[in-house]
Amino acid sequence: MKAAVVVFPGSNCDRDLAVAFEQAGFDVSMVWHKDSELPEGVDIVGVPGGFSYGDYLRCGAIAAQSPICKAVVAHAERGGYALGVCNGFQILTETGVLPGALLRNAGLKYICKTVDLAVATSDSAFTQGYNAGDVIGVPIAHHDGNYYADDATVQMLKDQDRVAFTYVDNPNGSVADIAGILSENRRVLGMMPHPERAADEGHGGTDGVAMFRALSGLLTDA
């Protein structure tokens, strides 16, 4: 199994995401933002958290125009798997791979803490290691994590069972308490919380491990 983790100027969670993939059995390649192609045979692309390009213009807006993002979009359009975490989620919305946008937190402050997430669906490669309704503890660290989409889009996400996670106690004002969403084919997940920071007992918890193990098991059997 092969994973590629994209690195932008300002990324700061790329190594954490790579380690989480490696611990689940993936062979991981780090891919620079100026590269125009993903490594051959990549099963899943990780778009990590951080502050790509200093969050200028809008979070993820400049990164979405980078050469590697064209390859990431093409990978997703071919049915490839992708995981966008925090800034990675912002980037995936900016590229149009996922609907909606991430706005400034309702409280206008940066938030860094562990929050409770409710697993909204177990019907995806990313969430099949959980049961719908499970509550897991996962860190957040963002200033612009307030998910927004219009009413029709939110209803579509609900009707298609594409809301992956919701906040138990909404920290940032996200519409419908949404913390993470799936693409139409359910092979792309964008989420503001950091599952890679909940993958080591020594770092505060392991509730994110099931996600990476589930991906590993699915792609091994594929």
Curated annotation (Swiss-Prot):
SMART domains in the record: GATase_5 (SM01211)
Pathway the protein contributes to: Purine metabolism; IMP biosynthesis via de novo pathway; 5-amino-1-(5-phospho-D-ribosyl)imidazole from N(2)-formyl-N(1)-(5-phospho-D-ribosyl)glycinamide: step 1/2
Superkingdom in the source lineage: Bacteria
Residue span(s) of domain Glutamine amidotransferase type-1: 3-222
Alphabetized Gene3D superfamilies for the sequence: 3.40.50.880
Any Gene Ontology biological process: 'de novo' IMP biosynthetic process
Catalytic residues as annotated in Swiss-Prot or TrEMBL: C86 (nucleophile), H194, E196
Assigned GO CC terms: cytoplasm
GO molecular-function terms, A-Z: ATP binding; glutaminase activity; phosphoribosylformylglycinamidine synthase activity
PROSITE patterns assigned: GATASE_TYPE_1 (PS51273)
Pfam families: GATase_5 (PF13507)
Catalyses which reaction(s): N(2)-formyl-N(1)-(5-phospho-beta-D-ribosyl)glycinamide + L-glutamine + ATP + H2O = 2-formamido-N(1)-(5-O-phospho-beta-D-ribosyl)acetamidine + L-glutamate + ADP + phosphate + H(+); L-glutamine + H2O = L-glutamate + NH4(+)
Xref: CDD domains: GATase1_FGAR_AT
Disulphide bond pairs: none
Quaternary structure note: Part of the FGAM synthase complex composed of 1 PurL, 1 PurQ and 2 PurS subunits.
Record protein name field: Phosphoribosylformylglycinamidine synthase subunit PurQ
Record organism: Ruegeria sp. (strain TM1040) (Silicibacter sp.)
Taxonomic lineage from the root: Bacteria, Pseudomonadati, Pseudomonadota, Alphaproteobacteria, Rhodobacterales
